[in-house]
């Protein structure tokens, strides 16, 4: 029941359940990424993307769950902007940059606080564009097909 590689933490007086949980956690931390994910992680590092393997695993899991890559990117961008504001609060030129984007996204997009990259594009493309065009396109494409069994298009009589 001695600490077998558990590292600094609970000593030999720790309950066996806690020690087993710590060992499982240590094993999980050692193998966070699968072989394919590790290869992708190494490629990302080679491309200059320095990131913790746990964070990379979260990103890969989000993409596996079919979360839109643009949404993941914009969420990371907004999170990094928040960190930049906190860390660069002494620099007067860095603080005004992220602050105008926060009220813009809240004012224009009612539910899209996380999407801070392009509120005008999301407003035009998401609400006005496809929202009005999509019902018109299928109805126009159905007319030449005949409309149903036994019916003929109106121009067939000529």
UniProtKB/Swiss-Prot annotation:
Residue numbers bearing the Phosphoserine modification: 34, 152
Q: Can the keyword Mitochondrion be found in this entry's annotation?
A: no
Q: Please provide one cellular component term from the Gene Ontology annotations of this protein.
A: spindle
InterPro entries for this protein: MOZART2
Q: Entry's Pfam families?
A: MOZART2 (PF12926)
Q: What is its main location?
A: cytoplasm
Q: Which stretches are tagged as biased composition: Gly residues?
A: 110-119
Q: Which UniProt keywords apply?
A: Cytoplasm, Cytoskeleton, Phosphoprotein
Does this UniProt record's set of keywords contain Ligase?
no
Region annotation (Disordered) maps to: 81-158
Cellular location of this protein? Cytoplasm, Cytoskeleton, Microtubule organizing center, Centrosome; Cytoplasm, Cytoskeleton, Spindle
This chain's function reads:
Required for the recruitment and the assembly of the gamma-tubulin ring complex (gTuRC) at the centrosome. The gTuRC regulates the minus-end nucleation of alpha-beta tubulin heterodimers that grow into microtubule protafilaments, a critical step in centrosome duplication and spindle formation.
The record's comment on protein family reads:
Belongs to the MOZART2 family.
Q: How does it assemble?
A: Associates with the gamma-tubulin ring complex (gTuRC) consisting of TUBGCP2, TUBGCP3, TUBGCP4, TUBGCP5 and TUBGCP6 and gamma-tubulin TUBG1 or TUBG2; within the complex, interacts with TUBGCP2; the interaction plays a role in gTuRC activation.
Q: What is this protein called?
A: Mitotic-spindle organizing protein 2
Q: Which organism is it from?
A: Bos taurus
Organism lineage reads as: Eukaryota, Metazoa, Chordata, Craniata, Vertebrata
- As recorded in Swiss-Prot or TrEMBL, the protein's gene is named MZT2
């Amino acid at each position: 029941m001695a600490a077998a590689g558990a590292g600094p933490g609970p000593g030999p007086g720790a309950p066996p359940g806690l020690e087993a949980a710590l060992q499982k956690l240590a094993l999980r931390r050692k193998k966070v990424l699968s072989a394919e994910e590790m290869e992708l992680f190494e490629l990302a590092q080679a491309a200059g993307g320095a990131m913790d393997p746990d964070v990379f695993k979260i990103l890969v899991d989000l993409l596996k769950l079919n979360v839109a890559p643009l949404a993941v990117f914009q969420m990371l961008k907004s999170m990094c902007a928040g960190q930049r504001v906190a860390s660069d609060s002494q620099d007067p030129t860095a603080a005004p940059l992220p602050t105008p984007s926060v009220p813009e996204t809240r004012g224009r997009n009612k539910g899209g606080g996380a999407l801070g990259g392009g509120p005008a594009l999301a407003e035009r493309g998401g609400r006005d564009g496809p929202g009005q065009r999509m019902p018109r396109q299928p109805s126009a494409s159905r007319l030449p097909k005949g409309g149903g069994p036994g019916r003929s298009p109106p121009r067939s009589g000529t």
